[in-house]
Amino acid sequence: MNNKNIRNVAIIAHVDHGKTTLVDALLKQSHIFRSNEQVAERVMDSNDLEKERGITILSKNTAVMYNDVKINIVDTPGHADFGGEVERVLKMVDGVLLLVDAFEGPMPQTREVLKKALSLHLKPIVVINKIDRPGCNPNKVVDQVLDLFIELGADDDQLDFPVIYASAKNGIAKMSLDEESDNVHCIFETIINTITPPECEIEGPAQMLVSNIDYDDYLGRIAVGRVERGTIKDGMPVAVCKADDKISNGKVAKLFTYMGLNKVEVEEMQAGDIIALSGITDINIGDTICDINKPEKIPFVNIDEPTVSMTFSVNDGPFAGREGKFVTSRHIRDRLFKELERNVSLRVKETDRAESFEVSGRGELHLSVLIETMRREGFELLVSRPKVIFKEIDGQKCEPIEKLVVNVPDDCIGNVIEKIGRRKGEMINMEPAELGHTKVEFKIPARGLIGYRTEFMTDTKGNGTMNSVFDCYEPYKGEISARTRGTLVAFETGTSVTYGLYNAQERGELFIGPGVEVYEGMIVGLNSKAEDISINVCKEKHLTNTRASGSDDALRLVPPIQLSLEKAIEFIQDDELVEVTPLNIRLRKKILDSKTREREARSKAKE
């Protein structure tokens, strides 16, 4: 297959705009699956977390054949926290499918990835998805996309983009809203006619940039990337140029190309195609695999720096080691450093305490996905409150600023603007959206967003959406007020009982029900006042010899607040930690002993 018959395309979209569903439709209609094969929904989201959250975290590769042309499709994460994945992927492709929701229009994360794609001079095709959704306005969205392209400095060729109207869920796509259609073939045809074949030297010494790493229990590390020059053959000796300019030698053990969702073994692949190869043990993202006689490095995309850091440490609580398989600092250290091999936007630093590690990432979601993955693998650990990473620019302390877009019901807008204002947010735009909603844009310090999402969902009664993306660094904006309510802290170790909880719930809201094991210093609820109070939730009712009438025994408890990992991370303050185990997520104070805590608080007050 010469490279005239290859097209490499990435799909860019905001979270939940239907990108993975569209890839499903393309795969099904290119007859990749046998007629009797059962196909799951969202086949590209391969890990459990992706399926549960409905987001794509890792970029995936697939390929389809249409009229003798091989179309390599790369599915990219839509969330800005996984921007490191997106930037690498764009180096492998010659064009992008920009997928936009016909109801919501272009969103901030779409904007960031699109900006990167346009700067690399990739050819865009715009797909307006969910045209079957009630209240949507596809024509208005096309105008918004055009405005966005102009704002991002697209050249004349990029501004002349084709528009396809689609409903990925129903498996249809058409070139105009009036057309009838029962398939997505026009997407294939537009890709073939609009996106140019890869410009590569088929002759010449082999060269390939590693854009992704896969892992197979049998084959070990698998390097994924596009062949930039020459031909790579099964069994050929190669040179590996590292990011630090060191060169090592290796040999290609097995060579694969993509077809549908599978890797197909091949003997050789020419420039222009996306391949996977095994056999090189110490291969990493950003390395260049070349002809052994002509090692030449390909420059690698600079990945955006992390903006948020958290401390991961060994669980030293009273229940440590009960529920997890991997509990020591060596286990945690090895797992974090292994994660660095694939997760290019992550940074891990050892601290002056052997049992703690500072982990930095692109945002709260980026880090919480890592914590959740480790939890499912059987790890036990403590994590601290996220902190933003400050920078010094021209002698001035600067902090990361996010661009925040909220879409809220009109009757909640005043409350939301006031709360964001308190968190040092500045409103930059406000416009009416469909169906009694208002869309407001803000610039806000990343610190101000930590812990706000849960409050936002409460204020909008679950009917609002908020999306943010890193914008720039600006001078430090000053203190932001923290949580206004204190906590209810367990006073002794034991099992919670209804009587103790009934007395505790008069002071605030509870996080636990009866029959839960607690320890001294564990946070069991939220106080209605500003200070923390110690409370005994294990306290039994003293028995008397007076017969009860029955009514005073029937103590009614309010159902406890369920805390997900994200909510727990957002909730804690600087003197608190989240204890993460495979079975439980607990909140606790850093100092468990109540008397020591009181002494610390008094000495701080004196300072």
Which role fits each region the language model picked out?
Residues 162, 189-193, 197, 220-607:
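Accessory interaction regions appended to the cores of large information-processing enzymes
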Residues 86-100, 105-149:
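Conserved P-loop NTPase nucleotide-binding/switch module
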